[in-house]
Regions:
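C-terminal glycine/acidic-rich active-site capping loop/insertion
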Residues: 165-169, 173-196, 270-319
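N-terminal Rossmann-like dinucleotide-binding module
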Residues: 1-49
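Beta-loop-alpha module in the N-terminal Rossmann-like domain of NAD(P)-dependent dehydrogenases
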Residues: 44, 49-110
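Hydrophobic residues in well-ordered beta-strands that form the structural core
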Residues: 93-94, 118-120, 282
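A contiguous active-site-proximal alpha/beta segment in oxidoreductase catalytic domains
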Residues: 99-179
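Mid-domain beta-loop-alpha active-site segment that forms a flexible
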Residues: 121-128, 158-223
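Contiguous beta-strand/loop segments that form the cofactor/metal-binding neighborhood of enzyme cores
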Residues: 196-288, 317-319
């Protein structure tokens, strides 16, 4: 039996990834409806992919016969996620699931009442290059340093390679109210005294850098302390980049750097794991491409020979 799924949010990530992939997995999923506050976007996506229903209200989607919903609309996603859980729908939430710990606790509470499955979109845990690197890291008992570097261009440079459509039919009032809710959530998370650079750096952590952080946690576990944090500011006071150093109970350190470099097309995201006898380097492709990442392993074998193995992970069909 196929899972009947509905999608909330018809922007770039839905058009580039979610709807095409779910369509390819037609033996397992049936997209029965899409929803967006932009009626034009919802109608376009429904017509292009021959999806039978489109909505501008998530309540209407939840009142249909969907088994599950995929939430990839503009943050925050808390309200619609909780409505979906209360409606008894299984929920997949694009990162971040929310912006405050209190909202996570609220989702967990509602989930425990309903018994549905709620999952967040931490897809890079299943990136073949990452899976390979993690299995290699599990053989190391002398990890001393992990280095994450994420030099992020404007997503538009990569999204423009795909057939996407944008529409201008969302009211200014709705845009402003959504922005206020998001800003209020950031204030709840950081406090009233947080400056603009901290607020924008926090959204970087909740945005593109979240992939690096959950990947790091999946390999190293929970750090024992934060040793240092620095935020670079733009002239307008927003965050240009962030760097921090974490320490783990083993004594290992992790250095994490994220920079917004909007104008150059090149996407540079790496995970490096250093030990005395083995080094692993994962190079990620942009999040809008299909598996094109690589994992380089340098090590000394049992005979004392130095080896270098570069693994390229090409696109493999999702079925």
């Amino acid at each position: 039996m196929r899972i009947k799924i509905g999608i909330v949010g018809c922007g770039d990530i839905a058009q580039v990834h979610h709807v095409p992939w779910l369509t390819e997995l037609a033996e397992e999923y049936e997209i029965v409806g899409v929803c967006d506050v932009s009626e034009s976007a919802a109608k376009y996506l429904a017509e292009w992919y021959k999806i039978p229903n489109y909505y501008t209200s998530h309540e209407d989607l939840l009142n249909s016969d969907v088994d599950a919903v995929l939430l990839c609309h503009t943050d925050p996603k808390t309200r619609i996620a909780i409505d979906a859980i209360k409606a008894g729908k299984y929920v997949f939430i694009e990162k971040p699931i929310c912006l405050t710990v209190d909202d996570v606790d609220l989702m967990i509470e509602e989930k425990s009442k309903s018994g549905v499955v709620v999952q967040t979109g931490y897809m890079k845990l299943f990136e073949p290059a990452y899976e390979f690197a993690r299995s290699e890291a599990e053989t190391m008992d002398d990890i001393s340093l992990i280095e994450i570097r994420h030099m992020h261009p404007n997503n538009k440079l990569h999204v423009d390679q795909f057939r996407t459509r944008k529409f201008g039919d969302i009211s200014q009032e709705l845009i402003e109210s959504t922005t206020k809710i998001r800003n209020d959530d950031i204030t709840r998370a950081l406090g009233e005294s947080a400056g603009l650079e901290a607020r924008t750096a926090y959204m970087t952590l909740c945005g593109s850098l979240i992939h690096d952080m959950y990947g790091l946690r999946n390999i190293m576990g929970t750090p024992s302390k934060v040793l240092n944090t620095e935020i670079w500011k733009r002239p307008d006071g927003t965050s240009k980049g962030i760097n921090f150093i974490l320490e783990y109970p083993s004594g290992a350190k992790a250095t994490v750097t994220h920079m917004d470099l909007p104008d150059l097309w090149d996407f540079d995201e790496t995970l490096k794991i250093y030990g005395d006898t083995k080094r692993i380097t994962v190079s990620y492709a942009t999040g809008f491409s299909k598996n094109q990442s690589s994992a380089l392993v340098q090590e000394i074998d049992s005979n004392g020979n130095h080896q270098r193995q570069n693994n390229i992970f090409l696109y493999v069909s999702s079925d």
